[in-house]
Amino acid sequence: MSENTTDNAALGQENVPAMPLAINLQYTKDLSFEVPAGASIFATLRSAPQISVNIDVQANRLEEDQAVYEVALAVRAEAAEPPAQEGGQAGRTVFIAELTYAAVVTLNNPPQELIEPILLVEVPRLIFPYVRSIVSDVTRDGGFPPVVLQPIDFVALWQAKRAQQFPEPAGEA
């Protein structure tokens, strides 16, 4: 038997701080895919549909006496037929994909000012690859080209959400 022990100091990891969170589990909380026009859309769709994507992040404390939270990343991708003429109204809805993907996390004594950014920026960033894969798979399995979600700036999303909740008084910048 050989001796293969790992010494963190030898690997240069003696000063690596511990993450202030642990992901306990991840799960698909809600998943829906519908083609409102049914099979007729496949016969009449002449060009690539226009796709709009909406994203939201929510965090809720699960237990009052423990730092255990559920973070839910909700995505709605809706595809519509392109307008018949330039500047016209979009046509029929081609498909709607809705996914709420969640993680249950435990926070390990982070500074108070970091709790919100950890829950609304860091955790969504960590679970986003799973969301991207599920949305891509469900749209492909629905008979359409896969919808590949582009990277999301969760910091900007968090800041926009904060600005809506706590608008600055007029005259202050």
UniProtKB/Swiss-Prot annotation:
Keyword presence, Iron-sulfur: no
**GO cellular component, as recorded:** cytoplasm
User: What is this protein called in UniProt?
Assistant: Protein-export protein SecB 1
Q: Which coarse location class applies to the principal site listed for this UniProt protein?
A: cytoplasm
Give a GO biological-process term: protein folding
Report the family membership: Belongs to the SecB family.
Tell me which InterPro entries the record gives: SecB (IPR003708), SecB-like_sf (IPR035958)
The coding gene here is: secB1
Print the keywords alphabetically.
Chaperone, Cytoplasm, Protein transport, Translocation, Transport
Domain of life, per UniProt, equals Bacteria
> Could you tell me one molecular function GO term of this UniProt entry?
unfolded protein binding
Function comment: One of the proteins required for the normal export of preproteins out of the cell cytoplasm. It is a molecular chaperone that binds to a subset of precursor proteins, maintaining them in a translocation-competent state. It also specifically binds to its receptor SecA.
* Localization (cell): Cytoplasm
Q: Outline the subunit composition.
A: Homotetramer, a dimer of dimers. One homotetramer interacts with 1 SecA dimer.
